[in-house]
Amino acid sequence: MRVEDFTPKLIPASPGVYLMKDSSGEVLYIGKAKNLRNRISTYFRKDGDSRERIPFLMKKTTDIETILVSNETEAFLLENNLIKKYHPKYNVLLKDDKTFFCLAISLTHLWPKIDVVRTKAVTSSKKQIIFGPYVSAEACRTLLEVISQWFPLRTCSNREFASRKRPCILYEMKRCLAPCVNLCSHEEYEQTLDKAVLFLKGQISEIVQDLEKSIEKASKEQKFEQAGMYYRTLKLIQQAMEKQHVEKFHFQNIDAIGLYRKYQKTVITVLTIRSGKLLGARHFPFSENAQEDADVLSSFILQYYTNQPQTPKEILTPIPLNIPDLPSLLNKDTPPQLRSPKTGYGRELLNLAKNNAQVHAETTIQSSALPYEELKKILKSPDYPYRIECYDNAHLQGSHAVGVYIVYENDALSPKDYRTFSISSSAYNDLAAFHEVLSRRFISLTSSIPDMILIDGGRTQYAQAKKTLKELNLTGIQVVSIAKEAGNHSGSLKNEKLFCDTFPQGVLLPPTSKLLQFFQKLRDEAHRFALSRHRKKRHKDFLLPKEKIPGIGEIKRKRLLQKFKSWEQVMKASQGELEAIPGLTKKDIQHVLAKQAEDTYLED
């Protein structure tokens, strides 16, 4: 449905999912609704949706697609799957961690031990039991230290275990059963391991009951040393429980989720409490998010906990989430309890999580973020520039000229989106080069259109950018140019002049201006990137002419140098030696031999 054709009657009053798209067909936002007609209609009413991101989203949206489902749960799952498929910029998308810190118990060894592992797969199998993921390797080691105090399992490597002739010092410290020299039975070791597993699952009451039964049984069988070991473990746990009760941690497995939002920034923080210990926090920053708080949280929770081997017993959220089936979607066997306490220890944890999220936002994101309030005053525009491209060029007296642009998106530099253009102008001219780069950048539109273009230059460069965009029929892109004051190109802190639509003649910004400092950082990064690309081009085109042979690219050149160690030796290689190099064709060998003959002729 085209946005200009919208009438409420066109939208069914049914549960479903809607996709908001721009003119190129890119999906900008995906939402779900119990009643699609009511939900979509709010976007078209002035008093319908007060979120500050919505006007900007609607300005870019040209088409809305709807998908009907049977119920709200189906809508929730479909929304999550479509977000993963399309990666819309205005939704929360949790990027997959490459690896996770976990604790693993290998079941392939007769006497298993618990190890800290870093793995992509966080699911248990027949070969190993996985616990986690945890926030860091340090958190894993903290848990291992507690386990070694309470449950005397082996910690040595398999090689050391096999070579042991007598017990190590850990046995003397009552922190290992010494299975390496058969000082315990397999049954006794397995019982201790089972208790450690219960501990990792947070089932402390079951451990206490098992220990009490084990003490009684060992005493009846007159195994007093074994009974003493169980008694010491029980006392350690009981003492810790008393201490933790005062600290209100209660040996539970809990995740507390904090949410902080300001302007276009969203940070979600997960506080991880395992077996009563606060192990740390993980922070997930997002930008350009247009979802409501409840949708942000439910979408995040489904992505974060799906496919994890264990979910905590409780997940605390700052606001109630009205999705009845969500716990069972996270874990069918042992669904976690989702609750939003208003008072007590749970609320204290939630406040702590929110404070952590706020601190992370203020110290990490905002330290490098665009000073939006100052920009809004100067540009007289409420639109937030989500994507900024900064342009620069580099050359050596007009030769080996390159033009580049760098990208600042989602409140961070995005090096994967940086681009380089070899400038083809025969007689180099700054304005002509800039016109060429800008034209080539936008003529194919293979990447997202920026909200703002930043240029290092004065009024002339600013006017050239505006003229080029007009020739390309591109509207809605803010153009900003910054230049040092006339006659001042020293490294000292001086005012700089900013040119934009509201100040085409320029406005002076003092060196203390946060906006100027932000633009200067982007300009410096663009300049660094332009110089590096120029030097690479110069090195390739000018500094190594002797090594240029038709058909011999970088890979084949490396193979030749690996074999012959230097280019001089390559130029002395025989045809038979060249034929032994993998990947060289007959034609390549002919080119190398021709180059050898050419160099010999020139030397003569």
Swiss-Prot record:
- GO biological process terms on file: nucleotide-excision repair; SOS response
Name the principal localization, coarsely classed.
Answer: cytoplasm
GO molecular function term, any single one: DNA binding
Q: Which superkingdom, per the lineage?
A: Bacteria
Q: Which PROSITE patterns match?
A: GIY_YIG, UVR, UVRC
Q: Does the keyword Nuclease apply?
A: no
- UVR domain sequence ranges: 205-240
**The keyword tRNA-binding is assigned to this record:** no
Cellular component GO terms held in the UniProt record: cytoplasm; excinuclease repair complex
Listed A to Z, the keywords are:
Cytoplasm, DNA damage, DNA excision, DNA repair, Excision nuclease, SOS response
Localisation per UniProt entry: Cytoplasm
Any Pfam family from its record, for instance, is UvrC_RNaseH
Q: Which InterPro entries match?
A: GIY-YIG_endonuc (IPR000305), GIY-YIG_endonuc_sf (IPR035901), GIY-YIG_UvrC_Cho (IPR047296), RuvA_2-like (IPR010994), UVR_dom (IPR001943), UVR_dom_sf (IPR036876), UvrABC_protein_C (IPR050066), UvrC (IPR004791)
Signal sequence annotation: none
Q: Which residues form the GIY-YIG domain?
A: 13-92
Q: Which family does it belong to?
A: Belongs to the UvrC family.
Quaternary structure note:
Interacts with UvrB in an incision complex.
Function, in words: The UvrABC repair system catalyzes the recognition and processing of DNA lesions. UvrC both incises the 5' and 3' sides of the lesion. The N-terminal half is responsible for the 3' incision and the C-terminal half is responsible for the 5' incision.
The protein's name in its UniProt record: UvrABC system protein C
What gene name is listed for this protein?
Answer: uvrC
